Curated annotation (Swiss-Prot):
GO cellular component assignments: cytosol
Positions marked as site (Important for catalytic activity): R218
Gene source species: Salmonella typhimurium (strain LT2 / SGSC1412 / ATCC 700720)
Keyword Transcription applies: no
Keywords (A to Z) from UniProt: Glycosyltransferase, Transferase
Binding site for a purine D-ribonucleoside: H5, E180, M181, E182, S204, D205
Protein role: Catalyzes the reversible phosphorolytic breakdown of the N-glycosidic bond in the beta-(deoxy)ribonucleoside molecules, with the formation of the corresponding free purine bases and pentose-1-phosphate. Acts on 6-amino and 6-oxopurines including deoxyinosine, deoxyguanosine, deoxyadenosine, adenosine, guanosine, and inosine.
Name the UniProt record assigns to this protein: Purine nucleoside phosphorylase DeoD-type
């Protein structure tokens, strides 16, 4: 039944949901990649859709910006609508010089300055990691599509406008591939409620070089990432 944030019914969502931050990007994904699309959520403008990809039922819905927002939506999808797998498809900023604009990053794990997982885990560090099979399927899908995806750690930041520039040096030293704002929270929610999750990001800007894509480009040109996510779902069905 409907929740305070999702006005859908059980069965409206597929067992796999792709989740960009921007609800308009969710609309673009649904209209571009799915067939037989119908809207299943519009509360607070957080658009959600269900359709089919090569005959496979798949949903896509926005999750908003930051860990608090995405945690609400992912929790409700899992506990109230029976969702089993969540794939965040978003953008990230690069800190390493060998990571380029529009590179695809598969988030094997997620560091964070947020305390949400410590709250969950009795103030201990929680290893926020993606589901192994989902990572493997995404890697295999990228190879099949001829996309040279990077695999490694993301950093989920609470502040978009961070005052601590030195932290980027630390991230680079530790091999962090990209900075975003949600993966660690989504991995924590999935672990808490027995679901599986993965984050795939496209590099939208470079923190060192100050290169960046436009908002319109973020909405329409990150197709490689979406294709990887969708094809990885089909690979997962074969397991």
């Amino acid at each position: 039944m409907a929740t305070p944030h999702i006005n859908a019914e059980m069965g409206d969502f597929a067992d796999v949901v792709l989740m960009p931050g921007d609800p308009l990007r969710a609309k673009h994904i649904a209209e571009t990649f799915l067939e037989n699309v119908r809207e299943v959520n519009n509360v607070r403008g957080m658009l959600g859709f269900t359709g089919t990809y090569k005959g496979r039922k798949i949903s896509v819905m926005g999750h908003g910006m930051g860990i608090p927002s995405c945690s609400i939506y992912t929790k409700e999808l899992i506990t109230d609508f029976g969702v089993k797998k969540i794939i965040r498809v978003g953008s990230c900023g690069a800190v390493r010089m060998d990571v380029k604009l529009r590179d695809v990053v598969i988030g094997m794990g997620a560091c964070t300055d947020s305390k949400v997982n410590r709250i969950r885990f009795k103030d201990h560090d929680f290893a926020a990691i993606a589901d192994f099979d989902m990572v493997r399927n995404a890697v295999d899908a990228a190879k099949a599509l001829g996309v040279d995806a990077r695999v490694g750690n993301l950093f989920s930041a609470d502040l978009f406008y961070s005052p601590d520039g030195e932290m980027f040096d630390v991230m680079e030293k530790y091999g962090v591939l990209g900075v975003e704002m949600e993966a660690a929270g989504i991995y924590g929610v999935a672990a808490e409620f027995g679901a599986k999750a993965l984050t795939i990001c496209t590099v939208s800007d470079h923190i060192r070089t100050h290169e960046q894509t436009t908002a319109a480009e973020r909405q329409t040109t990150f197709n490689d990432m979406i294709k990887i996510a969708l094809e990885s779902v089909l690979l997962g069905d074969k397991e």
